[in-house]
Protein backbone atom coordinates (compact mmCIF):
# COMPACT_ATOMS: atom_id res chain seq x y z
CA UNK A 1 0.00 0.00 0.00
CA UNK A 2 2.72 2.48 0.90
CA UNK A 3 4.70 1.48 -2.18
CA UNK A 4 1.74 2.41 -4.36
CA UNK A 5 1.39 5.78 -2.61
CA UNK A 6 5.06 6.63 -3.06
CA UNK A 7 5.01 5.88 -6.78
CA UNK A 8 1.84 7.88 -7.30
CA UNK A 9 3.31 10.92 -5.53
CA UNK A 10 4.81 12.10 -8.83
CA UNK A 11 1.64 14.02 -9.57
CA UNK A 12 2.70 16.54 -6.93
CA UNK A 13 5.63 17.63 -9.06
CA UNK A 14 3.37 18.86 -11.86
CA UNK A 15 2.92 22.63 -11.96
CA UNK A 16 -0.80 22.95 -12.62
CA UNK A 17 -0.53 26.72 -13.07
CA UNK A 18 1.51 26.08 -16.19
CA UNK A 19 -1.61 24.79 -17.92
CA UNK A 20 -3.94 27.60 -16.80
CA UNK A 21 -5.18 29.40 -19.91
CA UNK A 22 -5.98 32.56 -17.95
CA UNK A 23 -2.45 32.93 -16.57
CA UNK A 24 -0.87 36.16 -17.76
CA UNK A 25 2.58 35.75 -19.23
CA UNK A 26 4.34 38.95 -20.16
CA UNK A 27 6.03 37.98 -23.41
CA UNK A 28 8.81 40.13 -24.73
CA UNK A 29 8.94 39.54 -28.48
CA UNK A 30 11.91 41.77 -29.14
CA UNK A 31 9.67 44.79 -28.97
CA UNK A 32 12.48 47.09 -27.89
CA UNK A 33 13.53 47.35 -31.53
CA UNK A 34 10.18 48.79 -32.56
CA UNK A 35 10.53 52.50 -33.08
CA UNK A 36 6.99 53.12 -34.26
CA UNK A 37 5.97 54.65 -37.59
CA UNK A 38 8.46 56.52 -39.75
CA UNK A 39 7.67 60.18 -39.16
CA UNK A 40 9.56 61.32 -42.26
CA UNK A 41 7.53 59.06 -44.53
CA UNK A 42 4.27 60.23 -42.94
CA UNK A 43 5.24 63.90 -43.28
CA UNK A 44 6.22 63.50 -46.92
CA UNK A 45 2.88 61.83 -47.71
CA UNK A 46 1.04 64.64 -45.91
CA UNK A 47 2.97 67.31 -47.83
CA UNK A 48 2.15 65.59 -51.13
CA UNK A 49 -1.53 65.44 -50.17
CA UNK A 50 -1.65 61.65 -50.28
CA UNK A 51 -3.68 61.18 -47.12
CA UNK A 52 -4.45 57.48 -47.52
CA UNK A 53 -0.76 56.68 -47.93
CA UNK A 54 0.00 58.81 -44.87
CA UNK A 55 -2.53 56.79 -42.86
CA UNK A 56 -1.04 53.52 -44.12
CA UNK A 57 2.46 54.72 -43.21
CA UNK A 58 1.34 55.86 -39.75
CA UNK A 59 -0.24 52.47 -39.03
CA UNK A 60 2.60 50.46 -40.59
CA UNK A 61 4.89 49.83 -37.59
CA UNK A 62 2.84 50.03 -34.38
CA UNK A 63 4.80 49.89 -31.10
CA UNK A 64 2.58 47.20 -29.61
CA UNK A 65 5.26 44.95 -28.13
CA UNK A 66 7.42 47.69 -26.65
CA UNK A 67 7.23 48.84 -23.06
CA UNK A 68 8.63 52.31 -23.76
CA UNK A 69 5.85 54.82 -23.12
CA UNK A 70 7.77 57.53 -24.98
CA UNK A 71 7.75 55.46 -28.19
CA UNK A 72 4.02 54.78 -27.79
CA UNK A 73 3.26 58.47 -27.18
CA UNK A 74 5.30 59.48 -30.23
CA UNK A 75 3.46 56.97 -32.43
CA UNK A 76 0.11 58.13 -31.05
CA UNK A 77 0.90 61.76 -31.82
CA UNK A 78 1.95 60.85 -35.39
CA UNK A 79 -1.30 58.97 -36.01
CA UNK A 80 -3.35 61.75 -34.40
CA UNK A 81 -1.65 64.31 -36.66
CA UNK A 82 -2.64 62.23 -39.70
CA UNK A 83 -6.22 61.75 -38.50
CA UNK A 84 -6.69 65.47 -37.85
CA UNK A 85 -5.36 66.41 -41.30
CA UNK A 86 -8.06 64.39 -43.12
CA UNK A 87 -11.12 66.08 -44.56
CA UNK A 88 -14.45 64.75 -43.32
CA UNK A 89 -15.41 63.52 -46.80
CA UNK A 90 -12.27 61.40 -47.16
CA UNK A 91 -12.49 59.55 -43.84
CA UNK A 92 -14.83 56.79 -45.00
CA UNK A 93 -12.74 56.01 -48.07
CA UNK A 94 -9.58 55.83 -45.95
CA UNK A 95 -11.19 53.47 -43.43
CA UNK A 96 -12.48 51.25 -46.25
CA UNK A 97 -8.92 50.92 -47.56
CA UNK A 98 -7.84 49.21 -44.31
CA UNK A 99 -8.10 45.50 -43.59
CA UNK A 100 -9.65 44.10 -40.38
CA UNK A 101 -6.40 44.33 -38.41
CA UNK A 102 -5.85 47.85 -39.70
CA UNK A 103 -9.30 48.92 -38.52
CA UNK A 104 -8.62 47.37 -35.10
CA UNK A 105 -5.29 49.20 -34.89
CA UNK A 106 -6.98 52.43 -35.93
CA UNK A 107 -9.54 51.92 -33.17
CA UNK A 108 -6.71 51.47 -30.65
CA UNK A 109 -5.26 54.81 -31.69
CA UNK A 110 -8.70 56.45 -31.61
CA UNK A 111 -9.26 55.32 -28.02
CA UNK A 112 -5.72 56.39 -27.14
CA UNK A 113 -6.58 59.83 -28.54
CA UNK A 114 -9.73 59.91 -26.41
CA UNK A 115 -7.57 59.39 -23.31
CA UNK A 116 -5.83 62.74 -23.75
CA UNK A 117 -8.01 65.11 -25.79
CA UNK A 118 -6.55 68.27 -27.26
CA UNK A 119 -8.25 71.36 -28.68
CA UNK A 120 -10.12 69.89 -31.68
CA UNK A 121 -9.13 66.23 -31.56
CA UNK A 122 -12.28 64.85 -29.90
CA UNK A 123 -14.62 65.94 -32.70
CA UNK A 124 -12.30 64.52 -35.35
CA UNK A 125 -11.80 61.29 -33.40
CA UNK A 126 -15.57 60.87 -33.07
CA UNK A 127 -15.91 61.12 -36.86
CA UNK A 128 -13.17 58.51 -37.29
CA UNK A 129 -14.79 56.31 -34.64
CA UNK A 130 -18.11 56.43 -36.47
CA UNK A 131 -16.55 55.32 -39.77
CA UNK A 132 -14.31 52.68 -38.14
CA UNK A 133 -17.30 51.28 -36.27
CA UNK A 134 -19.23 51.03 -39.52
CA UNK A 135 -16.33 49.16 -41.13
CA UNK A 136 -15.27 46.94 -38.23
CA UNK A 137 -18.50 46.48 -36.33
CA UNK A 138 -18.92 46.12 -32.59
CA UNK A 139 -16.37 43.30 -32.62
CA UNK A 140 -13.67 45.85 -33.35
CA UNK A 141 -14.49 47.74 -30.15
CA UNK A 142 -14.54 44.52 -28.14
CA UNK A 143 -11.16 43.45 -29.53
CA UNK A 144 -9.63 46.82 -28.68
CA UNK A 145 -11.01 47.00 -25.16
CA UNK A 146 -10.01 43.42 -24.30
CA UNK A 147 -6.55 43.52 -25.89
CA UNK A 148 -3.66 43.16 -23.47
CA UNK A 149 -1.17 44.88 -25.75
CA UNK A 150 -1.77 48.57 -26.28
CA UNK A 151 -0.38 51.19 -28.60
Curated annotation (Swiss-Prot):
Assembly and oligomerization: Component of the Arp2/3 complex composed of ACTR2/ARP2, ACTR3/ARP3, ARPC1B/p41-ARC, ARPC2/p34-ARC, ARPC3/p21-ARC, ARPC4/p20-ARC and ARPC5/p16-ARC.
Keywords from the named record: Acetylation, Actin-binding, Cell projection, Cytoplasm, Cytoskeleton, Nucleus, Ubl conjugation
Name this polypeptide is given: Actin-related protein 2/3 complex subunit 5
Family named by the database record: Belongs to the ARPC5 family.
GO molecular function annotations of the record: actin filament binding; structural constituent of cytoskeleton
Gene from which the chain derives: Arpc5
Segments for region (Disordered): 21-44
Cellular component GO terms, alphabetical: Arp2/3 protein complex; cytoplasm; lamellipodium; nucleus; site of double-strand break
GO biological process: one example: Arp2/3 complex-mediated actin nucleation
Organism expressing this protein natively: Mus musculus (Mouse)
Localization of this protein: Cytoplasm, Cytoskeleton; Cell projection; Nucleus
PTM characteristics: Polyubiquitinated by RNF128 with 'Lys-63'-linked chains, leading to proteasomal degradation.
Record PTM N-acetylserine, positions in chain: 2
Function: Component of the Arp2/3 complex, a multiprotein complex that mediates actin polymerization upon stimulation by nucleation-promoting factor (NPF). The Arp2/3 complex mediates the formation of branched actin networks in the cytoplasm, providing the force for cell motility. In addition to its role in the cytoplasmic cytoskeleton, the Arp2/3 complex also promotes actin polymerization in the nucleus, thereby regulating gene transcription and repair of damaged DNA.
